[in-house]
C-alpha cells in the first residue's frame, strides 16, 4: 500500500506488521524478509509496509542505516498524522534512545500541548550533543521553577554548544545567565572564555569577563578583581577602562598601606606611555614589602619585616635579627611570602606540631604546599618540602598514597591542563565531570586517556558534552588512518564497548574488526603496543570471534601472548595438532622464542606440581621437545598428571645439551 491511502493506517495496523516481524524472527528469516522489503523499495520507495518492516529489522540488528524510518516519519509527519507518528516513535524508542524518534515525538507533543514535552526534550539533549536551542529552553524552564542546579546544568550545556556553533549573541545571553547563577566559579569562566576566544577570535572571551568582574567588585574581592583585569589587559594592554579599574582596585586592596600612593606614583602605572605590565610588576614588588610581611632570602632563609622607614627595611631573620636593607636591594634579593606559605609555617610553628598536622590532614597539607608555589605543583615538589624535614622516607610512602588518592578524587583539586603531573587548588569545587575532562585534556598518553574514559563511565554522568568529547577523541582514530597499529585497534575496541553500552552515541566504525585485522602487518607487534591488559584480551578474543582463520592467527600470537587460554581455545575447537605444534615450534626455534620456552617450563612445572624441574643455567635447547609437548598437552586437556617427583633436567635425555 502506498501513501495515497494513509487513512488506512492505524496503530493496530503496525501491530499486525510487528507480529509478522516476530514470526520471521522465530523462524530465523529476518534477513530474508528484509531483503524482500528492500527489493520492493527499489521500485516503490514510499511503500509504508516495506519501510516499516525494513526499518524495524535494521533497528533490531543495530544497523546504522535509519533511512527507512526517516522516510516513514517524514511521510506521516508531513500529512499531520500525529497519532501515527507518536506510535512509530514509541516503537523505535523501545530499542533505545534515538535522536530521530525523540525529535519527532517532541514535535508531536509540542503541537498537542502534551505535558511530557519537556521530558522528551531532556532525553533528546542528553543524546544530541549539537542541539543548543532546546537545551537553552530547558535551562530557562528550570530557572523559572527555581531549580538552580538543573538550570546551571543546562545553561552550561547550551553554552558549550553555542560556542561550538560560534553563535556570539546566544553565547552572550547564556553567559549572563551563568554569571548570575554561579559567579563564584571563576575558574569555569576563565576556562570557557578561553574556548570562546579560540572559536570567535582573540579578545571575545576577555570582554565577557567584565560581567564576572562586576560581581567580584560588588563583593569587594579585590584580589580576584585584579586577576580578571590583568587577564583583560593581556588581550589589550591599551584598554583604558581596565587600566583605570586596576589602579582603583589596588587602592582598595592596600588602603591601609603607608606607602600606597608613593608606590603608585613611582610605578607610573597611571601613565599611558608606561607598559602596563611593567608598571603593575613594579607596584606589586614595592607594595609587598610592608610591616609584618614575610620574606625569603636564599642565605638567611625566612624573615619578617619589623619596620619600614622611607626606603629602608628592618628585617628579623631567624639567625640575623634587626637586619637593615634598602628597599631597592630588597626588591631584587628577597621573595615575599604569604602567611600560609609552607616556608613560613616551617619557621613559625614547632616542627612536631606541624608534622602532626600534616600527617593527620594530608588534604590541608596539599593545599598549603600547592598554593605556596603559584598554585601549580607536583608531588615531587611536595616531597621536597616534607622529606626529611617533616616526614621520614617511610612515612612519605604511606602519606603519598593518601595524597595521590585525594588529588585524584577530591573536587577541591584539578590537574593543570598543560601538564598532567601538576595540580592546582580550586577556589570553587569542580564537578567530577569537569575534573576528569581537564585530566583527559592534560593527559598525553593514549592508554592513560582510556583509563580516564573508563573512570568517567563508572563514576560520572555520561550524558555530558565532556564525555562526548572524550568519546570523539577515540572516534577520530577510526575515521582516517594509514597504518593499523595498537592505537587504532584499541580505539576500535573502546568505541565498540562504549557504543554497546550507550548506543545513542554516533560511533564511527566504517571497518569491522576483521577488516582492520587484515591490514595489520604484524599482529604480535600490535599486541605489544596495546598497553591496557583488558584491551589486550579483547583483542585476542576478537581475533577468535571475527577472523575466519583465527586458529592460524592464534598460532602466530602465542609466543607473544603466552597464555594457556590460547592453547585451550585451540584444543577445545578441534585444533589439537596446531596447539601441540606451536609448543613444539617454540623449542625448535628456541633462539627466537626464549621467553616462550621459559614461560612453558614454569607453566608445566606449576601445573604438574614438580619442584625439581629447574631450568639449568646457560643451557641451550635441542629440537627434541617431544616430552615437553606431551606435558603441555596433558596440562591442557586435564589428563592424568605424569609422575614428576624425581623429574630433573637429566630426565629429558637430549633435551638439554
Curated annotation (Swiss-Prot):
Residues 1-152 form the GRAD2 domain. This is Putative GreA-associated domains protein. It comes from Treponema pallidum (strain Nichols). It comes from the Bacteria. Residues 153-657 form the GRAD1 domain.
Amino acid at each position: 500500500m502506498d501513501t495515497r491511502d494513509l487513512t488506512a493506517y492505524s496503530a493496530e495496523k503496525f501491530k499486525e506488521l510487528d507480529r509478522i516481524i516476530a514470526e520471521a524472527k522465530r523462524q530465523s528469516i529476518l534477513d530474508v524478509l528484509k531483503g524482500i522489503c528492500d527489493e520492493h523499495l527499489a521500485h516503490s520507495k514510499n511503500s509504508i509496509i516495506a519501510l516499516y518492516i525494513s526499518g524495524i529489522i535494521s533497528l533490531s540488528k543495530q544497523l546504522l542505516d535509519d533511512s527507512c524510518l526517516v522516510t516513514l516519519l517524514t511521510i506521516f509527519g508531513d500529512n499531520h498524522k500525529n497519532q501515527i507518528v507518536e506510535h512509530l516513535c514509541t516503537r523505535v524508542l523501545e530499542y533505545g534512545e534515538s535522536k530521530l524518534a525523540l525529535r519527532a515525538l517532541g514535535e508531536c507533543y509540542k503541537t498537542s500541548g502534551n505535558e511530557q514535552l519537556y521530558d522528551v526534550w531532556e532525553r533528546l539533549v542528553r543524546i544530541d550533543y549539537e542541539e543548543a536551542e532546546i537545551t537553552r529552553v530547558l535551562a530557562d524552564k528550570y530557572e523559572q521553577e527555581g531549580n538552580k542546579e538543573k538550570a546551571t546544568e543546562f545553561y552550561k550545556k547550551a553554552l558549550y554548544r553555542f560556542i561550538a556553533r560560534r553563535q556570539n549573541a546566544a553565547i552572550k545571553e547564556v553567559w549572563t545567565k551563568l554569571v548570575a547563577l554561579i559567579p563564584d566559579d571563576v575558574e569555569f569562566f576563565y576556562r570557557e572564555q578561553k574556548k570562546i576566544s579560540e572559536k570567535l577570535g582573540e579578545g571575545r572571551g576577555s570582554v565577557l569577563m567584565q560581567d564576572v568582574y562586576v560581581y567580584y567588585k560588588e563583593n569587594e574581592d579585590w584580589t580576584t578583581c585584579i586577576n580578571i583585569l590583568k587577564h583583560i589587559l593581556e588581550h589589550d594592554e591599551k584598554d583604558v577602562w581596565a587600566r583605570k579599574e586596576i589602579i582603583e582596585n589596588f587602592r582598595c586592596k592596600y588602603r591601609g598601606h603607608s606607602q600606597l600612593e608613593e608606590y603608585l606614583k613611582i610605578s607610573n602605572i597611571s601613565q599611558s606611555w608606561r607598559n602596563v605590565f611593567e608598571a603593575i610588576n613594579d607596584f606589586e614588588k614595592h607594595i609587598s614589602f610592608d610591616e609584618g610581611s614575610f620574606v625569603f632570602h636564599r642565605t638567611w632563609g625566612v624573615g619578617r619585616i619589623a619596620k619600614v622607614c622611607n626606603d629602608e627595611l628592618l628585617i628579623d631573620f631567624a639567625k640575623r635579627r634587626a637586619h637593615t636593607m634598602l628597599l631597592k636591594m630588597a626588591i631584587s634579593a628577597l621573595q615575599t611570602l604569604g602567611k600560609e606559605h609552607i616556608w613560613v609555617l616551617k619557621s613559625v610553628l614547632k616542627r612536631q606540631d606541624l608534622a602532626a598536622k600534616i600527617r593527620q590532614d594530608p588534604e590541608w597539607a596539599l593545599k598549603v604546599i600547592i598554593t605556596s608555589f603559584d598554585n601549580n605543583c607536583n608531588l615531587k615538589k611536595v616531597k621536597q618540602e616534607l622529606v626529611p624535614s617533616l616526614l621520614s622516607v617511610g612515612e612519605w610512602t604511606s602519606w603519598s598514597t593518601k595524597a595521590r588518592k585525594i588529588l585524584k578524587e577530591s573536587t577541591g583539586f584539578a590537574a593543570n591542563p598543560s601538564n598532567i603531573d601538576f595540580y592546582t587548588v580550586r577556589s570553587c569545587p569542580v564537578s567530577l565531570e569537569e575534573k576528569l575532562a581537564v585530566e583527559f585534556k592534560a593527559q598525553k598518553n593514549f592508554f592513560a586517556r582510556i583509563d580516564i574514559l573508563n573512570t568517567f563511565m563508572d563514576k560520572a554522568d555520561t550524558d555530558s558534552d565532556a564525555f562526548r568529547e572524550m568519546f570523539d577523541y577515540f572516534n577520530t582514530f577510526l575515521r582516517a588512518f594509514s597504518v593499523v597499529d595498537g592505537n587504532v585497534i584499541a580505539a576500535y575496541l573502546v568505541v565498540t564497548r562504549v557504543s554497546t553500552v550507550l548506543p545513542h552515541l554516533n560511533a564511527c566504525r566504517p571497518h569491522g574488526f576483521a577488516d582492520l585485522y587484515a591490514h595489520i602487518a604484524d599482529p604480535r607487534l600490535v599486541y605489544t603496543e596495546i598497553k591496557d591488559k583488558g584491551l589486550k584480551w579483547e583483542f585476542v578474543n576478537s581475533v577468535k570471534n571475527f577472523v575466519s582463520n583465527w586458529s592460524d592467527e592464534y598460532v602466530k600470537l602465542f609466543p607473544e601472548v603466552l597464555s594457556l587460554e590460547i592453547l585451550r581455545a585451540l584444543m577445545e575447537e578441534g585444533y589439537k595438532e596446531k596447539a601441540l605444534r606451536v609448543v613444539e615450534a617454540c623449542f625448535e626455534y628456541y633462539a627466537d622464542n626464549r621467553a616462550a620456552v621459559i614461560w612453558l617450563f614454569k607453566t608445566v612445572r606449576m601445573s604438574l606440581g614438580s619442584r625439581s624441574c629447574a631450568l639449568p643455567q646457560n643451557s641451550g635447547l635441542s629440537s627434541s621437545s617431544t616430552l615437553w609437548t606431551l606435558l603441555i598437552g596433558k596440562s591442557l586437556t586435564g589428563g592424568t598428571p605424569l609422575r614428576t617427583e624425581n623429574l630433573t633436567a637429566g630426565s629429558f635425555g637430549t633435551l638439554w645439551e
